[in-house]
């Protein structure tokens, strides 16, 4: 059986709000859509933190559990938990084999966490990962730049994912958006 991958996650801070969106498509290799309703964005730490994944589904669940454990260990300190996950992920021979990326956010901080040890906080409050990530990132940046007060973070996240779904064959229109205000 081929590698099963999930696709596009987008996150944004905008006008005091924040939102994360993900599509529902899970693809086997490059040929078969296995599921269209996967939930790749979740609430953690009593609903105060959002986390989303792109990559291998089983690997992502391992990372979700690890991140949630660190988040609890460090009493909700998002940056500390992300750094500790990245250190453990990069330093452990077995964990280094995991093929996934995480976006994590709370009301004030947005981070990308990868297995190569990166913990990246964007300058503009926008991140996107997965096969449609570049499309969602481009759409989201344009929307945020020109939306001003007319769009919420939730609306920007949903519109960015809709744009990615129109372009990327590995991203569908079954979009789940979670927001913190």
UniProtKB/Swiss-Prot annotation:
The active site is at 7. Allosterically activated by HslU binding. It is an enzyme of class 3 (hydrolase). Keywords: Allosteric enzyme, Cytoplasm, Hydrolase, Metal-binding, Protease, Sodium, Threonine protease. This is ATP-dependent protease subunit HslV. Its EC number is 3.4.25.2. GO terms for cellular component: HslUV protease complex; proteasome core complex. Na(+) binds at residues 165, 168, 171. The keyword Ribosomal protein does not apply. GO terms for biological process: proteolysis involved in protein catabolic process. Protease subunit of a proteasome-like degradation complex believed to be a general protein degrading machinery. It comes from the Bacteria. It is found in: Cytoplasm. A double ring-shaped homohexamer of HslV is capped on each side by a ring-shaped HslU homohexamer. The assembly of the HslU/HslV complex is dependent on binding of ATP. GO terms for molecular function: metal ion binding; threonine-type endopeptidase activity. Belongs to the peptidase T1B family. HslV subfamily. The gene is hslV. HAMAP family: HslV. It catalyses: ATP-dependent cleavage of peptide bonds with broad specificity.
């Amino acid at each position: 059986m081929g590698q099963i991958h999930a696709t596009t996650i987008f996150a944004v801070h905008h006008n005091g709000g924040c939102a994360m969106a993900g599509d529902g498509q899970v693809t086997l290799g490059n040929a078969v859509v296995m599921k269209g309703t996967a939930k790749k964005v979740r609430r953690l730490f009593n609903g105060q933190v959002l986390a989303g994944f792109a990559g291998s589904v089983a690997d992502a669940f391992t990372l979700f559990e690890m991140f949630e454990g660190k988040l609890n260990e460090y009493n909700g300190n998002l940056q500390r938990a992300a750094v500790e996950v990245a250190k453990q992920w990069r330093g452990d021979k077995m964990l280094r084999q995991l093929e996934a990326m995480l976006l994590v956010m709370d009301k004030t901080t947005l981070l990308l966490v990868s297995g190569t040890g990166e913990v990246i906080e964007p300058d503009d409050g926008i991140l996107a990962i997965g096969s449609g990530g570049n499309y969602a990132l481009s759409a989201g940046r344009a929307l945020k730049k020109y939306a001003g007060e007319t769009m919420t973070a939730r609306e920007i996240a949903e519109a960015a994912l809709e744009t990615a779904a129109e372009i990327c064959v590995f991203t569908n229109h079954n979009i789940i958006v979670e927001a913190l205000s």
